[in-house]
């Protein structure tokens, strides 16, 4: 059996970005902060995200069939902090931040360096997360070539 403390420290060495993942709760945009996001295919372009098993977001994504990923720029800690409690849309903003609806309504945040919307093509359960794989169906780039916000930059930790 592997030592969980040692394996946890080893896994913390993976460079994790911080992203705002969005979906729709009965047509209302909702968001969470996520850091387990990766591209898994070039053609077609597919992305995988992991959502905590206890998060309502996994139900929103499953019901709507879509999710968005908003890539935050380096220095965007305060922006990420606004989404830690998983806010929903209110008067054209989420967590006080402006957004626009993507092709299928998921939120694209105005302050993100880039945003993309995915149609769910597969989902599977890991022991403590639900993994969604989605095909990119809409995208916008606002600031190309900028460094992205990382978990390490914020000083935050994500562990159980």
Where in the sequence are the language-model features?
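Basic, polyanion-binding surface patches
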Residues: 1-160
């Amino acid at each position: 059996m592997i030592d969980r403390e040692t394996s946890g420290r080893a896994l913390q060495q993976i460079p994790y970005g911080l992203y705002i993942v969005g979906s729709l709760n009965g047509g209302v945009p909702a968001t969470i902060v996520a850091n387990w996001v990766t591209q898994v295919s070039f053609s077609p372009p597919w992305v995988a995200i992991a959502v905590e098993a206890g998060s309502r977001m996994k139900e929103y994504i499953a019901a709507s069939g879509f999710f968005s990923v908003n890539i935050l720029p380096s220095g965007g800690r305060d922006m990420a902090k606004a989404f830690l409690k998983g806010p929903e849309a209110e008067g054209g903003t989420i967590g006080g931040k402006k957004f626009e609806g993507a092709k299928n309504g998921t939120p694209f945040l105005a302050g993100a360096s880039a945003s993309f919307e995915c149609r769910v093509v597969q989902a599977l359960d890991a022991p403590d997360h639900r993994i969604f794989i989605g095909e990119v169906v809409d995208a916008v780039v606002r600031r190309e070539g900028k460094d992205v916000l990382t978990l390490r930059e914020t000083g935050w930790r994500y562990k159980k």
